[in-house]
A protein has these predicted regions:
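The N-lobe alphaC helix and its flanking beta3-alphaC-beta4 segment of protein kinase-like domains
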Residues: 45-70
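Conserved end of the kinase activation segment
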Residues: 194-207
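Conserved structural core of kinase catalytic domains
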Residues: 72-127
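Amphipathic alpha-helical segments that line or abut small-molecule/effector binding pockets
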Residues: 123-137, 141
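Conserved C-lobe activation region of Hanks-type protein kinase-like domains
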Residues: 210, 214-235
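Activation segment/activation loop of eukaryotic-type protein kinase catalytic domains
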Residues: 152-189, 193
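ATP-binding glycine-rich phosphate-binding loop
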Residues: 2-49, 71-72
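Catalytic-loop of the protein kinase fold
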Residues: 136, 140-157
Length: 235
């Protein structure tokens, strides 16, 4: 068990560290006993740069393009978690708990799509592409860049709604100080030509660079569907 302080309300929160919902290289995801709609992301080794970056993110959240549908398109930090050992260091944050969604690769892979969601048609793929573009546009409007665009960070529902996760890996630009907190990672297949063979930790991403991964993420599932259609009809 670990006790951490939840800001800005200054309440102490007890997290059970023996059972995690997921584990990554930098952090683990845990349930929040007092709220089933939230999860806590706790860093293995908190860094000072994360403190400032998360504070900027909390102060300047993007718009939610599917708020009218009661859906969360971007799993954004909602509250910061601080250590109670007197250091006041940020150890993680709370964010919405996302349920009933799968990685986008399960939908643009025909075999897994038939297995998990057999009624997910071509029209749903088009709707997924549109919703993904809307989520990216909402981030870009606030100056954020996803950076690490990959299939694991894009979740899709059975009704083609999209949620972006791992948002603390995004490139963040402080609108007040103009400091840029870069995204040091990325997948080659979603990296635009001008950033290939570059050290991401040394590069400021720009919104225009994400026309490439956005197009890739939108049209890969569509053309995979069409290629299967063409193989079965062009005989």
């Amino acid at each position: 068990m670990q006790v951490i302080r939840c800001l800005p309300n200054q309440q102490n929160l007890t997290i059970n560290l023996t059972v995690s919902l997921g584990r990554g290289g930098e952090a683990c995801i845990y349930t929040v006993p007092t709220d089933a709609n939230l999860v806590a992301k706790i860093y293995h080794k908190p860094k000072d740069a994360q403190d400032n970056k998360l504070s900027v993110m909390l102060a300047h959240p993007p718009e939610n393009p599917t708020a009218c549908l009661g859906h969360i398109s971007i799993a954004w930090p909602t509250e910061l978690l601080h250590s109670t050992d007197g250091s006041n260091r940020i150890t993680g944050f709370l964010m919405p708990r996302i349920r009933g969604m799968r990685p986008i690769i399960d939908f643009y892979n025909p075999r897994t799509r038939r297995q998990h969601c057999p009624l997910f048609s071509y029209q749903y793929l088009i709707r997924t592409a549109r919703n993904l573009a809307a989520a990216f546009a909402a981030l870009h409007a606030r100056g954020y860049c996803v950076g690490d665009v990959n299939e694991s960070n894009i979740l899709v529902s059975d009704t083609a709604l999209v949620t972006l996760v791992d948002t603390d890996s995004f490139q963040v630009r402080d609108p007040d100080s103009k400091i840029v907190y870069r995204c040091p990672v990325g997948k080659p297949e979603f990296t635009p030509p001008e950033l290939q063979n570059k050290t991401f930790a040394e590069c400021d991403r720009i919104v225009g660079s994400f026309d490439f991964p956005t197009a890739n993420g939108r049209y890969t599932p569509i053309f995979r569907y069409l290629s299967r259609y063409w193989r079965t009809t062009n005989v």
